[in-house]
């Protein structure tokens, strides 16, 4: 926060504190103390920077209110009084919905209209509960430029800018596939991105001078593809057409975003629901040296026998063998594979004493070299995230203004496809095995003429970034030249993707084509089970799937390797 306030000119400072997992954590906090439920980190940061923001005239907008935006607004007022820094505080509420049976939290994803109303009423600080990440930008932009709710193109441009900003340094070189091309000193501490937004919704992504990191079309493309799905990026304010986005260099560490078209938002709002799924425990057995497969089979049978003899057996048992071992290894660690046991049950006894008892029993009676990475534990509760949808008109969004007045915020106008932009259509990909949804596409390049190829990692020619949405994973893959794009769009089909990533198995995979970005976006449904909080697999948020894909070896035309 201090870096952004002191690094250069700024009108509005935004803060995104709410990942899907965060609301589950805040829900558990609120069970212990109903006065909690908001991100306390925001208050700690604000204590150091409130006076600075006031002095520089910077408005602050953050979704740190979590499950208790009114409580956070009160806490900010108390902080303001204690520091003797007078500020006008407002908050947005109405996202909290009646809880379905067994749910811990249920929150609709609101748009930026409530934020805009608070700013129009003179708020210096606006805190919200669950809003879309992009709403932290669309709200201030709509206030600043006095946009109406049907100025879809401008709002869509702000949505795209907000999506680029939402994950901070991921737009300035953080977690970037081609990081080795940058000077190491620039990556030690990447600066945060900022957006210069114009009245027509176009923007320039940049960063404060002198901060670390890099902003170029590659870093912005990577973030644009992160945690998205098709060409239509639907939100509560507008549906942004990602297939219309154009990125152009605008000087050092500056990328211009233009051409974004918008449509009316869908008639429903997304609702994030979290609940305690039950109890979970995990034991990781270390298998060192020879006969790894046989050792794994022995311990599986021994644990199954122990469970069969126990009074209560875990309802869900899964095993995963990771062959991290190497032959003739020079260190013990390199000679070892890991066998991961995960159990789940509604009864803590079934995942606690039963599992720890089985593991202890094996300590002197199992495979040679038996040991585990950590002592068996009692287990712990785990969370589950799911998404639902509710009619937008049924959600009563309210802006609580600095005066205390409550302003009802109507739902944005809903409707059909925006005039001037046709409906999504299937591109002509008859030559490739792909299910693809894209909109008003420019012609795809012809198939690259056959010629000599070389077996190289896919990442030699393309970048990738992956992320999670509930139990799904998206993998965005992009080319950096027209020639590579012409090869990529025809070569990396859904069938190819499945072959490269066997873990995908029989799951549904959808491929989306974004020609303006020279990019493909693959969505794998259900790869993460019930979401990050359930920790269903290694890499529970799917962050490394893109880099795994890049590491896979494919035949690439020699002409593209440079």
Model-predicted regions and their roles:
Residues 96-128:
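An acidic, phosphate/nucleotide-engaging active-site surface
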Residues 18-36, 54-56, 95-102:
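Gly-rich Lys/Arg/Thr-decorated short loops/hinges at beta-loop-alpha junctions or inter-strand turns
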Residues 8-26, 48:
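N-terminal glycine-rich anion-binding loops that anchor highly charged ligand groups
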Residues 63-66, 123-140, 463-483:
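Conserved phosphate/anionic-ligand binding catalytic regions in large, soluble enzymes, centered on
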Residues 9, 259-429, 439-445, 455, ...:
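C-terminal non-catalytic interaction/assembly regions of soluble proteins
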Residues 507-562:
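Helix-rich interaction surfaces within compact, conserved domain-sized segments
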Residues 160-259:
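A conserved active-site cap/scaffold subdomain adjacent to cofactor or substrate pockets
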Residues 82-94, 138-179, 490:
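Catalytic or ion-translocation cores adjacent to nucleophile or general acid/base/metal-coordination motifs
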